[in-house]
Design a protein with these regions (language model features):
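Second-shell loop/turn segments in exported
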Residues: 1-3, 20-29, 52-54, 85-94, ...
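A non-catalytic alpha/beta surface segment that caps or lines the substrate-entry region
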Residues: 8-71, 218-220
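Acidic/histidine-rich catalytic neighborhood of metal-dependent amide-processing enzymes
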Residues: 85-203, 226-229
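Active-site-adjacent substrate-binding region
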Residues: 3, 167-290
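Structural recognition of the beta-strand scaffold that forms the well-ordered cores
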Residues: 65, 76-79, 120-123, 154-159, ...
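Solvent-exposed loop/turn segments at secondary-structure junctions
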Residues: 55-57, 70-72, 82-86, 126-130, ...
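Extracytoplasmic/secreted proteins, especially bacterial periplasmic and envelope-associated proteins
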Residues: 8-11, 15, 29, 33, ...
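Acidic/histidine-rich, surface-exposed loop or edge segments in extracytoplasmic proteins
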Residues: 12-23, 123-124, 183-188, 259-261
């Protein structure tokens, strides 16, 4: 099976972080440049992208969607947001996740995966403030659309900040002291983050990633909207009764560059990012649908 390539992901993040003006909600030309880049890169694999558009504060924004095995009735959604918060490069948040999603799609095609379900790859806009938590988030727009269309969704996997790691002891922070007893103090692992309401789906993805993984995988589940559980696009699928979880490096609990100008490409660990994507690729072959 073909494996993730760190160099390809580096090139993707390099493009995203070098865009000027920065790819926040105010800079429509930069957001459009991201969409065009995605079309060009993914167009090398397959045609047939759908642009889902909506209006927010008088401007038009875009989710870019591609369906793998579109003939399959049962669908898995995999998504990552491509906008940033304010004026900063956004290498980890969320260039790492965009690159990871592109690489996942590349590998699905390169390995010609025959799955019992189809995958909808979704690149979202407007995850960041001032739209976070509103119905103008791109993921809310998408979640509402699949719910209205009564699509058979088995679940949603959100990539959110998957590129910052450290081998320094004590480098991992926690939102509550009690969690120090459950998780490592060294920030060299990846997490699946969900809510107890969808434990069956959560465990399927967690165990599917953990098996044979080169990188340590841990699971965190908390009640709706609490702590790290609802900090990205997965939150909007819960509102429509769709199981969803996040793949995450624990964000600001680990990365001191969160929402800062220092969130640049040189802070990312592309070898470990590759291990995360390889683990997810194997997981996709282990998902059981009934």
């Amino acid at each position: 099976m073909n494996r993730a390539q760190a160099q390809r992901m580096y090139e993707d993040v390099s493009f995203l972080t070098q865009l000027r003006p920065f790819r926040n909600y105010e800079n429509l030309e930069s957001l459009a440049a991201v969409v065009n880049y995605l079309k060009e890169e993914l167009g090398l694999l397959s045609q047939g992208f759908f642009e889902q558009k909506w209006m927010a504060e008088g401007n038009e924004y875009t989710n870019l969607i591609h369906s793998y095995q579109p003939n399959k009735t049962k669908r898995l959604i995999m998504g990552a947001h491509y906008d940033v918060c304010g004026d900063q490069p956004g290498a980890d948040d969320n260039g790492s996740a965009v690159a990871g999603l592109i690489e996942t799609m590349r590998l699905v095609y390169e390995n010609n995966l025959e799955l019992d379900y189809g995958i909808d790859f979704v690149f979202y806009c407007l995850e960041e403030p001032p739209f976070f938590g509103t119905e103008e988030m791109g993921s809310y727009v998408h979640a509402k659309s699949v719910s209205n269309n009564k699509e058979n969704i088995i679940g949603m996997i959100c990539y959110e900040m998957i590129g910052y790691f450290s081998d320094k002891k004590g480098s991992q922070g926690f939102p509550h002291p009690a969690l120090k007893l459950l998780y490592p103090s060294t920030a060299n692992f990846i997490m699946t983050v969900g809510v107890p309401e969808y434990d069956k789906f959560n465990q399927m993805i967690y165990k599917g990633m953990k098996k044979d993984s080169e990188i340590s995988v841990y699971h965190f589940a908390h009640s709706l909207g609490r702590s790290l559980a609802g900090m990205s696009d997965q939150r909007n699928y819960w509102k429509f009764g769709i199981p969803a979880l996040m793949i995450n490096d624990t964000s600001f609990e680990r990365n001191p560059n969160y929402h800062k100008m220092t969130d640049d490409i040189e802070t990312l660990d592309f070898d470990r990012m590759s291990q995360v994507i390889d683990s997810m690729l194997r997981c996709l072959t282990r998902i059981e649908v009934s």
